[in-house]
């Protein structure tokens, strides 16, 4: 019943929860039914949860994004690195296909995953590629830092914390977590410290590689509930990592020397091939990387074997750095122009200034990562003074502002002339 008379007063009741109009804030009438604000809010929560669930599983059950579509989205945010984008796009596409294959009927052919290793100099876009993937993917995605990892039992994070983050990302839904993608940054920092086995335990190097082996290949990880610490007589969440795709990235400083030592061994005698050590840049050298070079660098052979796809990123030249400054959707120049527009001021960075920024980043060997610090230093004083200045219409940054630290040019708005009375 939705209506009831009490002491001459006609009381209305919610048709769903039965509460009276006095027990709720609002009662909305329909054809012979009523619904209260509390039931409406509950319905909205149910619909939101269902929509969120369908979005999370769209990559598995819906239309698969093709490698071309994935690559086109990466192009909007990351300049260059065409080969690395292709490798990532194909790997992610195949990951979606594997999940769909597993969710369907069982087949005699078992599809195994192809984990990826990204090799490239600092500031070449490894982390940005991973962050951009995180925005466009419909499967859980987490990033981890290899430098914080140690063997279990030592101070620091153990490798199972990575899976714990994956669980947290999808609100401890184990099925979703088992279909996720993990990006481990700075993987080169856990290389073995020496070619020869040491009598002291290498808890943050080879020890971490050994711990990651089974996790990357596929194992049942025991995760404490709600991020607690492990202790006896505790129920653990069991997560199978067999279908979790792992992408590892690192700068691998010094790997180029290992590759050159292998490829440029000089022969002796008349039949020896003469090779020049000059004219090869870092990009060309990294393209010649072989598993044996990674082992020589300090990764254990078993770990290298579990990363079958190796993608190398190019060293960014001056033109590429300028493109990064102005072309992507979230380009650095666009970000600063937005900040200045909030003060009602236009910001113009002249082409010569852009070239100066790029040259400075190359000189510092910081790649694209160093662009922000250079621009921030050049614009710091004007950003400090601008809120106190009246009538500034435009700020112009030229080459001298970047190279010599001179102040940018300020253009003031013309003041309207007031005609004097005779």
From Swiss-Prot:
Q: What one GO molecular function would you report for this record?
A: ATP hydrolysis activity
From the broadest rank down, the organism's phylogenetic lineage runs: Bacteria, Pseudomonadati, Pseudomonadota, Betaproteobacteria, Rhodocyclales
Query: Which InterPro entries does the UniProt entry name for this protein?
Result: AAA+_ATPase, ATP-dep_Clp_protease_ClpX, ATPase_AAA_core, Clp_ATPase_C, Clp_protease_ATP-bd_su_ClpX, ClpX_bact, P-loop_NTPase, Znf_CppX_C4
Query: Which residues bind ATP per the record?
Result: 121-128
Any one of the GO BP annotations? cell division
Binding partners and assembly: Component of the ClpX-ClpP complex. Forms a hexameric ring that, in the presence of ATP, binds to fourteen ClpP subunits assembled into a disk-like structure with a central cavity, resembling the structure of eukaryotic proteasomes.
For binding Zn(2+), which residues are annotated in this chain's numbering? 14, 17, 36, 39
| Domain ClpX-type ZB, first and last residues per copy | 1-55
Family of this protein: Belongs to the ClpX chaperone family.
For this entry, the protein name equals ATP-dependent Clp protease ATP-binding subunit ClpX
Q: Which PROSITE patterns match?
A: CLPX_ZB
Give the species: Azoarcus sp. (strain BH72)
Query: Which terms in the GO cellular component ontology are assigned?
Result: HslUV protease complex
| Main function | ATP-dependent specificity component of the Clp protease. It directs the protease to specific substrates. Can perform chaperone functions in the absence of ClpP.
Sorted keywords for this record are: ATP-binding, Chaperone, Metal-binding, Nucleotide-binding, Zinc
Q: What gene is this protein translated from?
A: clpX
Q: Which domain of life is it from?
A: Bacteria
Q: Which HAMAP family match?
A: ClpX
